């Protein structure tokens, strides 16, 4: 079964593949779609077991990356694309680079977890306890607020929450929490900007440093004052950062090298 795909912009322009975070769909890139569709060809899929690709199951990093490689090969201008990923999508982007780096021009990966998260073993049983109540409007709102999803996207967020099955959420969380650095990264020279928000846990900064150190063409920066979901919560800064990276211009002043602590 094919993935749901939305395309924007001129087909002959350089392509950008946007890979969304866990639990939401391609709609979460709406601020970037509006900012970049005028001069780039945008590929915005719903990843397996997400949004309108809910029936493409089960989710796994290797399958998702293989599907993204096929998508670039078939739909991207010239058979290659820039890749932009957030959270789960950035993990898929890492695997895509490892297995099909020749298809990727420049990459921007934000909020990429590579390390064990304390208490991860409790998340799956907690999810099953939460599942019967996940569609209660009050809980949907709390979850939306905790993830930094703006009010303007309440309807889309609520719809994705209601559509998601417990099995899908379990598959996605397992893949996310088990993700570690894949083999093959050390040979990569793709220009890659690894990002982390200042307000993310310190483990995410360590992951960013680790990922950047593993790739010859990578560099790690921290976005001052930003949360994990900053492409949606602070799109103006994210869009300036992305455009600067794609056009090989200096990064905004709000971006600083990831500190050692």
Regions found by a protein language model. Give the residues of each.
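Conserved HGGG/HGGXW glycine-rich cap/lid loop of the alpha/beta-hydrolase fold
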Residues: 4-54
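Active-site loop/oxyanion-hole signature of alpha/beta-hydrolase fold enzymes
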Residues: 34, 43-84, 240
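Flexible "cap/lid" loop of the alpha/beta hydrolase fold
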Residues: 91-94, 98-99, 104-134
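Conserved alpha/beta-hydrolase catalytic His-Asp/Glu region
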Residues: 118-120, 134-187
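Short beta-strand/loop motif that positions the catalytic acidic residue
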Residues: 188, 194-196
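Short alpha-helix in the alpha/beta-hydrolase fold that links the catalytic acid
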Residues: 190, 204-213
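Acidic catalytic loop of the alpha/beta-hydrolase fold
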Residues: 199-203
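Catalytic histidine-centered segment of alpha/beta-hydrolase-like enzymes
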Residues: 226-235, 239
